[in-house]
A protein has these predicted regions:
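Beta-alpha-beta core module
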Residues: 26, 32-39, 44-45, 105-154
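Extended ligand-binding regions for polar small-molecule ligands
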Residues: 65, 145, 149-178
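Flexible hinge/capping segments at coil-to-helix
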Residues: 30-72
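Hydrophobic hinge/microswitch elements
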Residues: 2, 8-13, 18, 77-134
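Secondary-structure junction motif
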Residues: 20, 24-25, 56-57, 64-93, ...
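Short helix-loop capping/hinge motifs at secondary-structure junctions, enriched
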Residues: 53-62, 140-142, 153-159
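N-terminal winged-helix
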Residues: 1-6, 155-158
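Alpha-helical segments flanking ligand/cofactor-binding loops in enzyme cores
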Residues: 4-5, 39, 65, 108-109, ...
């Protein structure tokens, strides 16, 4: 929710969010109320990030059942913690072990140190993260539509355009919108 507020209040020129079957109608309404526009960048199937030493890291695909014994890591949602605004898809699935973190560095450290996992798009930058994190497809009947939001009728500006240009270098090109 904070990213929507930041863009609405012009603290940010753009923000990155995702739509899923679960959250699309709620988020679309919130964006319309706040005069914000969603532009899709790409669509992805759910993946999990695992440490390269995780027992499931070498599998071609994993299931939620296989992940059950490992801690699921997710981001704290701040003051507005409705599950419609969760940063991870499948956020309503009950998990035996759940750890909430506030930043990416902590999440990756716990992925490695505790054999945890997080559900994600599967997009990872090797130049930023090295080889310590693997992305493995998750067997789930879901899709994630990732895009950016901006204020309707306002240009992104030089910095916003440059950010999107750099971001597009790391997204799946077969599905990306140029």
């Amino acid at each position: 929710f904070e990213v929507i507020e930041d863009v609405k209040n012009a603290r940010s020129a753009l923000g990155i969010i995702y739509f899923s079957r679960f959250n699309e109608s709620v988020l679309s309404g919130v964006l319309a109320e706040n005069h914000l526009l969603f532009t899709r960048l790409f669509t992805a199937a759910p993946h999990v990030f695992l440490s390269s030493g995780h027992p499931l890291a070498g599998k071609e695909r994993v299931t939620l059942e296989e992940l059950e014994e490992y801690p699921c890591l997710s981001y704290e949602q701040g003051e507005y913690n409705s599950f419609y605004f969760a940063e991870e898809i499948l956020s309503t699935v009950k998990r035996r072990k759940q750890i909430r973190v506030s930043d990416r560095a902590t999440l990756f450290n716990l992925l490695i140190g505790m054999n945890g996992y997080t559900i994600c798009t599967g997009v990872i930058s090797r130049e930023l993260n090295g080889d310590s994190i693997n992305s493995v497809p998750l067997s789930a009947d879901e899709e994630i539509r990732i895009g950016y939001i901006c204020r309707k009728g306002e240009p992104l500006g030089t910095l916003g355009e440059r950010y999107l240009e750099l971001m597009r270098r790391h997204i799946p090109q077969d599905d990306a919108i140029a």
